[in-house]
Amino acid sequence: PRTVGMSRRDLERQGFAGEVGQSVVIPRRDGATVIAVGVGERPSSGDLRDAAAVAVRNAQRHQDVTLDLLSAGSSNSADARAVTEGALLAAYRYPGITAKPDTQPRFASLTIVTSGAAAVERGVREGVVRSRATYLARDLANTPPAHLNARDLEVIVTDLAPTHGFDVEVFDENDLEEMGCGGLLG
């Protein structure tokens, strides 16, 4: 309650009890918006991930988002990773093929308030890496087959391999036939 600038009683009057996933949006006179999101008594990393996602979805039109992990009583790497993932994945929009670009603004900066900077920084880095990988997987899965065929996928993956340290093995039609991949060839 201290962080959002309202007493527990005032929050309860708004119908907010702090239950997992529950949220209330509180506009302030200075133009900022505070979003209180419930995480329960002893939040798990999953609860914190979900809470970060709820906060970001509620803060859609705001460029700067601050998530207070300290109020949730956490300062460890796993929770920081979960909060980062929740925030970034909630902001994901398929950029896809469209005549009308997505004009919905997403946040430009994300600040996580906490203690234990070294552990939190490590968790944030891991969360960013995992979120980027998920963005790529979502983009590829959401792209219609007419716009992303096997050769396109080959180019994307071979371009990513040196940067991200993985090997790529490309099979041609004959290789696939020898491997018994008739269904894939069909």
Language model feature labels by segment:
Residues 1-186:
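Short amphipathic alpha-helical segment within the helicase RecA-like ATPase core
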